[in-house]
Amino acid sequence: MDHTECNNRIEYLQNKVLELESLNENLKGQLEYFQTKFLESNLNSEGKDISSCLTEIYNSLSLDNNNNNSNSNSNSNNNSSNSNNNSYSNFNSNNNTTNNTKVIKNRNFKINLTNSNSTNSSPYIFGNNKDNSNNSNNSNNNNSNTELSNDHLSLEDNIATTNTTTTTTINTSNSNNSNNNNNNNNNNNNNNNNNNNNNNKPTSNRPPVAPRSFIRSNSDTFITPPGSPTSSRNSPTNKSSPQFLSPLSKSPLSQSTQSTTVSSPSPSWTTTVPQSKMRSETIVQSKSPYSPDTNISNKLINELASNIGAPNSNGSESPSKNSPRSLNSNNNNSSATTSITTPPTTSTPTPTTSTTTTTTTERRPEDRRSKTSPFPNVGTTTPPLSNSAHLVRTQSASGANAVKPQSQLSTSCTVNMIGGGGTPRSNNSSNGSLYHSMSSNGLIENLSTSSSLSLSSTSPSPNNSQQNLTNPFEIGADDELEVLDDPRLVMVKTENGFIVKGGTIEKLVNRLIAKHDPDFTSAFLLTHKSFTTSIELLDLLIEFYVNNKDSSSINSNSSSSSSSAVASSSFSNINCNISDLSSSTSSTNSLLINSITNSPIINSNNQNNQNNNNNNNNNNNNNNNQLEINGDKKKKAIRLKITNVIKSWVDKHYYDFSEDKQLTLKLDQFITNHIMFDMDKIGFNLKRLLTNDRVVPVPTFTQGPPTPIPPKMKSNGSEINFKDLDPTEIARQLTLYESDLFRKIGAKECLGQAWNKDGKEENAPNIVSFIKRFNQVSSWVATEIVRQEKLKDRVSYIKRFILVAQECRKLNNFNATMEILSGLQNSSVYRLRKTWERVESKPLLKNTLDELMSLMSSGANYKNYIQELHNIHPPCIPYLGVYLTHLTFIEDGMKNVLTTTTATTTNTTTTTTTTTTTTTTNTTTSNNNNQQQLNGANRSFDDVIINFEKCRKISVVIREIKQYQQQQYHLHTEEFTLRYLSNLPSIQTQKSMYKLSLICEPKEKETSSFDSGYGSVSDRPSKKEFSVTSLLNSFKS
């Protein structure tokens, strides 16, 4: 493999990388668009499901696409008609043909593409210089005239270049100078009209769609890159154009497709205008990885044009980009496709035309981070990708008129003055010196000055002008690595990506708004009261919202003033340089220079410079307007995200507002003054949620509730006792009663071990009530058993309680099951050996008890119970003691604060070390330390790194509790049974129950018959698995 082929392969692979990067950015932009539209549709909807929202978005794309297609067609026609009247340089045409001229304007030059009739038209052109030169030599009758003219030039130069294959000639005459002002004025008027038309175009919110897949040829094999020996385009016998299959229609593309090809020693690019566009092809034009306003095809064509002046591989210098070129392309095969071939030239100096405004592209390191806006550009289409024998980039003709961004341009103004009949000399100097060349009397052969006339003026950069528009929390997927270096936000990488481990309050709110992370949002809103207050959180959200308001006049004044300053400084520098030049020459030369300065040529040049500056001002204003539109779209997306956070907060955590009237009033004022002003329908929905005017979901059941079982009524009218109630109905009514208590538990009651601290009746009233109910039922079970003096009655009561526990298990009431088993394991009941001997003598009853004991066993951290809980279908009532135990371990074992930003900056490993979970033996000391950490850093959030990992673990427990609170039981109330369970009979204390137990079965010697049959008490694993004392102590206040 030779050196040339290797370079071609490298360039081919680099181009493929650019295509893949563009495809990736298109997909990112499309995803951001759908997320934004889904948020907006979700905020406006009233009970719509996801599929309905997505269907509306999809239908809106169809309508936007049809409108945009009609607009783009009309705009392209207008541009074509305007460009035919405003061409400055005309090519020599030897034959009279009817030409259809199209204009592709690219910043400071435009290409007039003149297509003539031909019998052969190919939709794609291979970028082979050898083939192009052969085709141009075979041209006789039909002309394909191509004009390459500068927007602000009127002079035509006669340039003779030496080349063995193609000769390029431009005739220059001084008679054209008199037409400068008229042509420039007409051009300025047309440009202003085009700018006004572009500004009046309706904006579209359609998403950028990924380019089409690679277009393969008839064979499925990989296409050889350009320059390889096996490439089909190098074969001299290959005369016909290859057939390309469309990925949408799976048929060869129509040959009536008009395209424009720029051929050069490097791979060429094609501008294609298909006759008809499908909706997936013309949804929207994506942004290139190079600039926010141009697509890939235009960018690469601009780079190709800017590299013409650089030395080529043969060591010869290509013509300068500053001079316009007229190429006579006599190719009879290019009627539908006009190619501009730039041949290699010798080192002969190339002249520059009068008053040239050059555009240089600054080379910068490649930035592969996503620059995709959540909203697409206006009036552009997606360039489909192709995979032909060489790289072919296609786009619509209307998309070729995109203006390059000002941030990557530096405008240089150079004055080159020539006398009558003189030949201009090429400006090969890098400092842009002023050259005078006159042939009359040979007075001045070559005169140059050391003072440069090259004025470099940088127009306002989009980055600089949009500093106020950028939001401080726009964190994309590709920016996570930068966030890792932020000392105020601690992040760790997991299998599912990066997660937040800690951060300041501002950074956490920043992340809450910027990233669509339901887990993070839920964890933050559930646990925010552990490190801040609801009022302060609302203040931060309001601040972010107000800072992202639309601003329509941020860039207009600054851009106009800077442009006028550039224009004035341009003329002052020119006059200064001319005066310096006249002072440094002899008197004879000074007279000549004065006559040159006052000549009509210089006056017309000054007029041209003024027109150029006016056009630049118009372009700057258009760019600034586009930047402002894009900035407003980003701000609108940010405001939608903030509004969605507020909606989630009010909808799913309304208890924060129902208990804080000041918070409700402040949010109501914010909705009225800001959200309803920007988005009235969304504001109305938020107000409805804030007033708790929401639709309460009514559960629907496929089957009716079971028929209640009434108790056995006594004939004498005495009170009902436990034996009169049915075990199944006891389980049902017990479940209904405890379900109401469980569903009242709020998320804030689970924070900070509020159920174990002072003021628990106020901070966690529902958890305290639930714990009291658990202890009450357990004591009631034990009391009912020890009150029975007869052995037979005690066995009967134990049997009934086991049956009630079994029915509670069938109803998924694990809490009641645990209550009954705790009562059976009470020390006063457990010591009744004779009673348990009778119970275990019944195999069916014993097996049922063993199954329940095994299910609710505390071994392996309640492994069997947790596994069963996750396998059942709600409704259910979980055993609350497991959740309270987990919350206690998290609160005691993890700190509330990781470290400060200063410590994080100096030592990064300290942040990671402090997140390790440590178990403390003194619960009171740990709680006091955590509280002191928050109180010591009270409201100084700039220095506090909140341990969000602790908040996340707490939120996991709270979310599981809330998950089982959603669905209610479908049971009827039985009045007598529920009244009995609500007012349980008098319950004895532990000492009283133990005395009753001694009455039932007095203490016996260790050699009793019971001990001889079962051994010691420790030999009964099914009964010894529970420790009633530990259970009761864990729920004591």
From Swiss-Prot:
The keyword Transferase does not apply. Residues 5-35 form a coiled coil. Residues 229-239, 282-300, 372-387, 424-437, 1027-1037 have a biased composition (Polar residues). SMART domains: RasGEF, RasGEFN. Residues 726-1003 form the Ras-GEF domain. Gene3D superfamilies: Ras guanine-nucleotide exchange factors catalytic domain (1.10.840.10), Son of sevenless (SoS) protein Chain: S domain 1 (1.20.870.10). Disruption phenotype: Poor in phototaxis assays. Residues 361-370 have a biased composition (Basic and acidic residues). Residues 114-145, 166-200, 240-276, 318-360, 907-930 have a biased composition (Low complexity). The keyword Coiled coil applies. One of its GO terms (cellular component) is plasma membrane. Keywords: Coiled coil, Guanine-nucleotide releasing factor. This is Ras guanine nucleotide exchange factor E. SUPFAM superfamilies: Ras GEF (SSF48366). Promotes the exchange of Ras-bound GDP by GTP. Seems to play a role in chemotaxis. Residues 496-694 form the N-terminal Ras-GEF domain. GO terms for biological process: cellular response to differentiation-inducing factor 1; positive phototaxis; protein localization to nucleus; Ras protein signal transduction; thermotaxis. It comes from the Eukaryota. One of its GO terms (molecular function) is guanyl-nucleotide exchange factor activity. CDD domains: RasGEF, REM. Residues 65-100, 114-150, 166-387, 414-437, 451-472, 602-628, 907-935, 1004-1037 are annotated as: Disordered.
